[in-house]
């Protein structure tokens, strides 16, 4: 058995009048991500971490933003696809550790639902998904409330 680690990152600008979806959950907020799909930064970074750990490219390779069929797509579909590819390559998800960076809204109260949504899309127990939230202390686009970002590390074991 071998262990592999992947890292993922995503950032989206925020605009008024768009839905804010993070970790598969729609959050009450007046801004949401500008993106080709639903703009779920956590799901996108997680997808990249999983694909990278397995040596399977990145989210843009599998779901190019130039393809109209992914316009407005639910990012949970991306995670389900990544899980299918991991299964085909005989990889099991051991652990996911994520940080979402945003000034608002506060994410902590929504973590249980996010963990359930992510675990469900990946077919793993919620104990394998760990989430944290940080602010940028008012610094840069994230700190000014103009963007949201996520960093994710995923650990896989070969079966």
Residue ranges with predicted function:
Residues 1-2, 159:
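SAM-dependent methyltransferases
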Residues 2-113, 117, 121-122:
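RNase III-family endoribonuclease catalytic core
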Residues 30-31, 139-141:
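A generic structural signal for short coil/turn motifs at secondary-structure boundaries
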Residues 109-110, 140, 144:
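Acidic (Asp/Glu) carboxylate-rich active-site/surface patches
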Residues 143-159:
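C-terminal edge-of-domain segments
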Residues 131-135:
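Pyridoxal 5′-phosphate
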Residues 125-128:
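Short acidic capping loops at alpha-helix termini that bridge into adjacent secondary structure
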């Amino acid at each position: 058995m071998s262990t592999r680690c992947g890292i993922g990152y995503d950032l989206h600008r925020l605009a008024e009048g768009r839905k804010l979806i993070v970790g598969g959950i729609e959050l009450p907020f007046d801004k949401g991500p500008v993106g080709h799909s639903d703009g779920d930064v956590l799901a996108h970074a997680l997808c990249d971490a999983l694909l990278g750990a397995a040596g399977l490219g990145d989210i843009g390779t599998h779901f190019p933003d130039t393809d109209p069929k992914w316009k407005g797509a639910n990012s949970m579909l991306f995670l389900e696809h990544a899980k299918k590819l991991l299964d085909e390559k005989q990889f099991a998800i051991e652990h996911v550790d994520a940080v979402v960076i945003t000034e608002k809204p506060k994410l902590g109260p929504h973590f249980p639902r996010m963990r359930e949504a992510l675990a469900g899309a990946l077919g793993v127990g919620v104990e394998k998904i760990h989430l944290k939230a940080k602010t940028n202390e008012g610094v840069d686009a994230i700190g000014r409330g103009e963007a949201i970002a996520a960093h994710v590390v995923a650990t896989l074991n070969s079966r």
